[in-house]
Amino acid sequence: IAVGTRPDCLDGEKLALLAGCGLDEIWLELGLQTCRDDTLRRINRGHTARQAEEAVRAALDAGLLVCGHLMAGLPGEDEDDFLDGVDWAVSLGMQGLKLHNVYVPQGTELARQWQEGGYRPLARDEYVDMLCAALPRIPSTVVMQRIQADPAPGELLAPAWALEKRGIITDLR
């Protein structure tokens, strides 16, 4: 099974429950998003990078497989920030990673910022360039479980290319 949560929602009781449920393979997916505390505050994540590190270590110590989620194109971040996040995530020793482009869903604070011109999502070629810079930094022992966000068509405001998964894979080739 795979269970996803935020680092600040994880405690010893939940880890013990997952570790003790008797399944052969349990993945804990943690929404790390970035290693930058200023960005985590800006996007109202409710946790710090240190809390994320502690959650990863605790989950690994409990014997769980851990997959971290990172986002490219967060408000106020650039490619260097994203790559710093990739390096940071790799250093934590997780077995899996999911990389996501930020997209703008309807009815959110990010949608308001985008509509007012205060946020610009990554262009497709910018995201592909970031992936091309990030993927070689990730050891072959780390399972890449995703390389693009998966928005529902009815919720997506921008960017339109976020619905074209095959296009990103083609661009990477």
Q: Model regions: which residues?
A:
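Core AdoMet radical
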Residues: 1-10, 24-52, 98
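Catalytic cores of alpha/beta
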Residues: 12-18, 75-91, 131-132, 154-156
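Active-site glycine- and acidic-residue-rich loops that bind
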Residues: 7-11, 45-48, 74-86, 120-128
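Conserved N-terminal glycine/acidic-rich loop preference
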Residues: 1-8, 37, 50, 59-64, ...
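Auxiliary Fe-S-binding modules of radical SAM enzymes
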Residues: 90-92, 96, 103-173
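Acidic (Asp/Glu)-rich catalytic clusters
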Residues: 16-25, 57-61
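Hydrophobic faces of well-ordered beta-strands that scaffold small-molecule active sites
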Residues: 1-3, 26-30, 66-70, 95-99, ...
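Conserved strand-turn element in the central/C-terminal portion of the radical SAM core barrel
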Residues: 37, 59-81, 101-106, 113-121, ...
